[in-house]
């Protein structure tokens, strides 16, 4: 009987540093999604620091890593140490690496506190789906509640992102959360005396919204040496399974920075481009005192303009490949967007599309 999780399971997936083999982790995370998990996928060649930062900012229950590069013992132990140092030892670590991880190394890692390293023997006994269900069952933990951490955050962050992340989790799971800590309810001194702008970025799936967002973040950090930025990024949930691929971090090269916070949300509904928790997530980021907030929607159709309700300035990202010029008249956001970005401008017909728009 397939295991059905009682809670919304969120897992960070990646292939380890110096490892270009991403086939295995892509297979695993797709099965996780089919079982209803929300997967924050980072891609391959990811460092421990990047993975741990993402796991803490996203407030996940687990991290799943494939490692075929030979340095797995040090890699997994350092990940465990970094989580513990930052008061997030509750985040469980799972891994696999085929025959590159020896049985005695697996035993050593289990004793060190790694939740589970799956061996080729486990694959033969349990099968792919059996291993994934085991991961999801072990991660089926409720994270609601106050963000009371016993140790200070040691990552180089200008704000305690653990508290911010947990408050957004509460908002996702409970709607208007009654469990928000006093620090998260009380506006910071900066947020009381300034207007915090929200830029909404929307567009069709694959138009390059995340790449545009990353470029804005890069330029923001370069131009303002003392300002902070928060990103709330939404991806669609699958109607059939409830799972979601939250993959915007793959395109984000500038977010591993002390002045940047990013949170990925699933819509947890079909036929919508935004999560029901977007409004409170933005409020939480404002209360925390971020200077600038970007809201990135899931891919939208011609009629969707829902992002306008949540932002001060809206941007519609599109490509030159939209068909005949008459198709532009059907796109609702072109009537309302403050900015239109024609991305992938190296494509044929880009100058014509600029004229048509």
Task: Mark where each language-model region is.
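Residues at the beta-strand->loop junction immediately N-terminal to the Walker
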Residues: 14, 202-205
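Cofactor-cradling patches in redox/metallo enzymes
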Residues: 18, 25-131
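Conserved phosphate-handling catalytic cores of large alpha/beta enzymes
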Residues: 85, 103, 110-158, 313-357
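Extreme N-terminal, non-catalytic leader segments
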Residues: 128-198
